[in-house]
Amino acid sequence: MCIRDRYKQVYSPDHPVPYAELLNEQTEPVMRELHERGVKCAIASSSYRELIDELVEIAGIADVLDYTISGHECSAFKPDPEIYLRAMEALGVEPAECLVIEDSPLGIEAGKRSGARVLALRPHEGVNLDQSRADAVIDNLTDILAAL
């Protein structure tokens, strides 16, 4: 049994993560607005597939997503751009047409290396991440709508 499976079996049941409480409240309305505007949307996350699917369900955005991919389904992790390039291919779009929303330095680098424009979502107060390589830093998910 791998460490992740053992963790889920032993630790997780007694220590659930309150994802619904941690979810950015702007996620669903912004994703719905993007969908209404005809913007193709994907989630390209380094998280495990099970967690991505769980968070998509909690956020209530499965019906407005065109594609999801886990870093564990790729041959290389961020900062390698593979995850973004595969998402772009699945959506049938070119890198220059894409806007990547990231927070981590490795994700920002992966997005830049894919050829997309990258917006960095400023982290919560007290979290210090180097987001200097992003094309711009945004404070709220609603700022995405103005960036299109």
Where do the language-model regions lie?
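Flexible, active-site-adjacent loop/turn segments at secondary-structure boundaries
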Residues: 1, 21, 75
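Disulfide-bonded cysteines in secreted/extracellular proteins and peptides
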Residues: 1-2, 98
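A general lysine-centric signal
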Residues: 3, 7-8, 40, 78, ...
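Metal-dependent phosphoesterase signature
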Residues: 4-28, 37
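A generic structural signal for short
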Residues: 18-20, 40-41, 72, 96
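Asp-based, Mg2+/Mn2+-dependent phosphohydrolase catalytic module
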Residues: 32-35, 49, 53-148
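Hydrophobic beta-strand core positions in alpha/beta domains
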Residues: 42-43, 120
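Conserved phosphate-coupling serine/threonine residues in phosphotransfer and NTP-handling enzymes
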Residues: 45-47
